[in-house]
Structure formats: C-alpha cells, structure tokens
C-alpha cells in the first residue's frame, strides 16, 4: 500500500501569502514567524533603492518565496479611458471626476472610494507585470519568481492570465478572499484563481479547524494573509504570535514552505506512476511516502 506525505511524513502544510512589501511591517512579521519555522511567500511590486540596497532585500527575504504583485499596484482599466486632465497630478487639488497621467504611459491616477489609486490599460498592465518580473529576478535571481498575485483582487481578465502563462511561465495567480475551510483544506488545483484560507480576522479560528481536520489520506493546505500592516492596523500582532507559537516548530505535523514549493510538491506526487510492482517518480523532486506502513522516500527520477 502506497501512502503519500509531505516532507517529514506529515499531511498538512502551512504557508502564508503577504502582499505589498511594507518593509517595516514585513520585518515585524518575519520576526514573529521565522523563529517558529513558519515559511511562506512575500508578494512584491516595487523596490525603494533610494533607501535600501538589493543586498538588503535579499537578506531580509532570504528563505522565503517571492511572487510578482505588479509594479505600481494598479487596477485594470476596463472600457474607455475617460476624461484625462491636462494638468499634472496633485492629490490635494485634483478633480476627482478626472483621470491624471502618471510617469508610465497607459497608467492613470483615479479617485476610488478610499482615495487616489492607479489603473492601467491592458497593454500597460502587462508591461508592468513584465517590468516587475525583471526587477524581482534581478534582485532574487533568475527563476525565483514563478507566480502572480493580483493587486486589489482578481481583475477578471483572461488576457492577463494568458499573458503571465505565455510570457513568464507562471503557474498560479492568487486572488483575494478568505476561503476558510470551504474546500476541505484541499491543495488548490485551479491555480489561476486560488486564494488563502485565513487573514488576520480569522487566523486562530481557522487554524484550529485545520489542526482538528481529520486525516483523509490526502495532502492538505493552509495559507494565511494578506498584508503585514493588517496586523498593525488591527492591533493583533499578539494573535499572530499566538498562532506562530502554537503551530510553528512542529515539523512532524506540519510542512512549512513557500506557496509555490507546496504546489510543486503536490504536483510531483500526482505524477507518480505505479506499474506492476514498480513505483516510478519521473519528477525532479524527492517524495516522502510510506510503503506498507514503512516510511521511505522516492528519489528524483527513480524507480523502486
């Protein structure tokens, strides 16, 4: 009998997905999760090289995953552009009914219900994704960025999803919204529309459900988000600390990894082949299994 596990022979993974690259808040977040062995992904959209060096970013985010969160953090402009003001943008004097040009062609300042934001034409949006990809990989290394996270949630564009797959080979795009336990904590298979299970609002409650979730023989997935500054604004760093202390440093029960690593591992388990009395691992990933109750591993590109 073949049983599939995560590394460490556990069946539950824990990760996080944190947006925007707020340096001070990300530092505080990391200071809580990292000592407890909890890993995840930071979704970045820009660098402040006037203040921080590439080495600073590499050191700060070392050991974590990095995803593309789109340069300039725009909405997608849908329909006609609308009226564009001639004068330069000034948030204090701008007409809220008009658009204002930014430094990037096809990207405009506009007034949303919660203040001034940016939106981009489809062409400009795709260009910003590519610019962000190049800048991230220049800092973190070629091949370090393999997925996309929508600014402001899923913008409903099949064209953009096709673009990130064809241009950059991305295998996942994260939207916004707490899934909680609605999927039975299954590893997302619709990777172009996946979302996290919990945020600062329900982290401890959802984690308790996850811990109690019965082992049904399948690999499970729990990710929480969504901005480090959320924990500051809601005054709930204590809840994050409680979560990290309670659910961290338990490698025999939880697998801690960046989101993309969990997805790749899961996909590798689904690629296993059983032929007669042989188990074939055609992937480049070591897979943890039990055969007739005995723990073992399937080395990359191996047959046992």
Feature locations, PLM:
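Metal-dependent polysaccharide deacetylase catalytic core of the NodB/CE4 family, i.e.
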Residues: 34-160, 177-194, 219-228
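A short, Lys/Arg-enriched amphipathic alpha-helix followed by its capping loop at the start of a domain
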Residues: 28-38, 243-247
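C-terminal domain-boundary segment and adjacent tail
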Residues: 1-8, 48-51, 137-138, 169-185, ...
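Active-site metal-binding loops of divalent metal-dependent hydrolases
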Residues: 18-21, 70, 228, 259
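Catalytic-core region of carbohydrate-active enzymes that cleave or remodel glycosidic bonds
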Residues: 131, 135-139, 159-177, 197-219, ...
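Hydrophobic "anchor" residues on beta-strands that sit immediately upstream
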Residues: 15-16, 65, 254
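Boundary/entry segment of secreted carbohydrate-active catalytic domains
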Residues: 1-27, 193-196
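N-terminal accessory interaction module
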Residues: 91-102, 108, 287-304
């Amino acid at each position: 009998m073949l049983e599939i596990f995560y590394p460490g022979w556990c069946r539950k993974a824990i990760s996080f997905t944190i947006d925007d690259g707020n340096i001070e808040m990300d530092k505080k977040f990391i200071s809580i999760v990292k000592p407890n062995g909890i890993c995840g992904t930071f979704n970045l959209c820009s660098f402040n090289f006037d203040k921080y060096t590439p080495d600073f970013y590499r050191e700060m985010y070392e050991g974590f995953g990095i995803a593309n969160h789109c340069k300039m953090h725009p909405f997608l402009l849908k329909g006609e552009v609308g009226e564009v003001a001639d004068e330069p943008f000034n948030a204090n004097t701008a007409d809220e009914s008009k658009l204002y040009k930014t430094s990037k062609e096809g990207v405009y300042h506009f007034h949303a219900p919660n203040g001034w934001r940016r939106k981009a034409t489809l062409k400009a949006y795709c260009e910003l994704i590519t610019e962000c990809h190049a800048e991230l990989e220049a800092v973190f290394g070629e091949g370090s960025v393999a997925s996309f996270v929508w600014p402001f949630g899923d913008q409903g564009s099949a064209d953009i999803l096709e673009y990130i797959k064809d241009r950059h080979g991305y295998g996942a795009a994260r939207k916004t919204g707490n899934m909680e336990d609605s999927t039975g904590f299954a590893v997302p298979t619709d990777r172009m529309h996946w979302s996290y299970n919990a945020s600062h609002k329900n982290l401890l409650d959802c984690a308790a459900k996850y811990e109690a979730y019965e082992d049904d023989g399948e690999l499970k997935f729990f990710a929480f988000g969504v901005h480090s500054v959320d924990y500051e604004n809601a005054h709930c760093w204590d809840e994050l600390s409680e979560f990290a202390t309670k659910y961290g440093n338990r490698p025999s029960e939880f697998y801690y990894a960046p989101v993309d690593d969990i997805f790749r591992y899961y996909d590798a388990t689904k690629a296993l082949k059983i032929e007669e009395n042989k188990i074939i691992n055609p992937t480049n990933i070591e897979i943890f299994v039990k055969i007739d109750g005995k723990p073992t591993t399937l080395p990359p590109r191996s047959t046992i």
